[in-house]
Amino acid sequence: MSNNPNNSGQPNKTQSILQEVDKVKDVMHNNIGLMLNNHDKASNLQDKTASMSNNARLFKKQTVTIRRQMWCRNMKLQLIIIAVVILVLAVILIPIIMKFV
């Protein structure tokens, strides 16, 4: 019976196949673990992206508000400067005009 080619390699072949199955199982377990880890990272990245998007929207809204406020302040300052210049010119020119009239 030991000379029969069909039976002589069966235990080694079965053991070899079982070892390969174990290796494939280990690889699949590692792949599943990596996949779950990548899923968690992608989920965290998605949360951070949503948060950054909200922050960007808020930042844009605040900058528009501040830009309007600064424009109004600038206009007020320019009007005050123009009024002061007109007042100074009036103070200087009115006495001169009154002398010649």
From Swiss-Prot:
Give the protein name, as stated in the record: Synaptobrevin-B
Question: What membrane topology does the annotation report for this chain?
Answer: Single-pass type IV membrane protein
Instruction: Tell me where in this chain the v-SNARE coiled-coil homology domain is found.
Output: 13-73
Role summary = Involved in the targeting and/or fusion of transport vesicles to their target membrane.
Instruction: Please tell me whether the keyword ATP-binding is annotated for this protein.
Output: no
Q: Where in the cell is it found?
A: Cytoplasmic vesicle, Secretory vesicle membrane
Q: Which organism is it from?
A: Dictyostelium discoideum
Which keywords does the record carry? Coiled coil, Cytoplasmic vesicle, Membrane, Transmembrane, Transmembrane helix
Residues exposed to the Cytoplasmic side: 1-76
Q: Which GO terms describe its molecular function?
A: SNAP receptor activity; syntaxin binding
Question: Which InterPro entries has this protein been placed in?
Answer: Synaptobrevin-like, Synaptobrevin/VAMP, V_SNARE_CC
Q: Quick one: which gene encodes this?
A: sybB
